[in-house]
């Protein structure tokens, strides 16, 4: 049985800020503020995507920062009622496709050591555990697992995102 949710992946814009800020508060003990999210939207080295449900509501979102040929996934969050329905995977696959198309050397992320479902998702997408950041998270204090997916690259990467992540949609 297919349990995936039909969502549309689009670049995040200012119209999504309130919903994404609320999602941050629901999902994280130390959430990004609306102002932080707004600043990230304007950052030329960053891209943020939202997954919209059939009614146009934000079901989830993810962010990435790219410097030269390195990508860092900053955030992945999915509304509790939409978890385990393929939303995070769909968001991350857009970033994986972008990374390959722009010859990034790798994508990396951090995840709470206790977040087994997220780690299983990342492993399924080809990320591997490459280290730990001791006591990285607060509320509760916890280690971060550093996970990286490397790409086979031949040549120079040129991965300028532009504010808002133009071109990162499905």
Regions found by a protein language model. Name each.
Residues 85, 134, 150-152:
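Acyl-donor (CoA/ACP) binding surface of acyl/acetyltransferases
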Residues 89, 141-151:
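Accessory recognition modules or surfaces
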Residues 108-110, 123, 128-145, 168:
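Conserved catalytic-core motifs of GNAT/GCN5-like acyltransferases
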């Amino acid at each position: 049985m297919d349990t995936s949710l039909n969502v549309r992946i689009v670049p995040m814009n200012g119209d999504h800020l309130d919903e994404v800020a609320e999602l941050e508060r629901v999902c994280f003990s130390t959430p990004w503020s609306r102002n932080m999210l707004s600043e990230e939207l304007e950052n030329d080295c960053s891209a943020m995507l939202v997954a919209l449900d059939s009614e146009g509501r934000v079901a989830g979102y993810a962010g990435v920062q790219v410097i030269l040929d390195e990508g860092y996934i900053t955030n992945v969050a999915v509304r509790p009622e939409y978890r385990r329905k393929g939303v995070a995977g769909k968001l991350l696959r857009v970033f994986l496709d972008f990374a390959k198309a722009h010859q990034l050397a790798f994508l990396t992320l951090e995840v709470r050591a206790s977040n087994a479902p997220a780690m299983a998702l990342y492993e399924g997408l080809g990320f591997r555990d490459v280290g730990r950041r001791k006591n990285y998270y607060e509320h509760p204090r916890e280690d971060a697992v550093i996970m990286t997916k490397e790409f086979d690259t031949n040549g120079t990467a040129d991965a300028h995102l532009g504010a808002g992540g133009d071109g990162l949609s499905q």
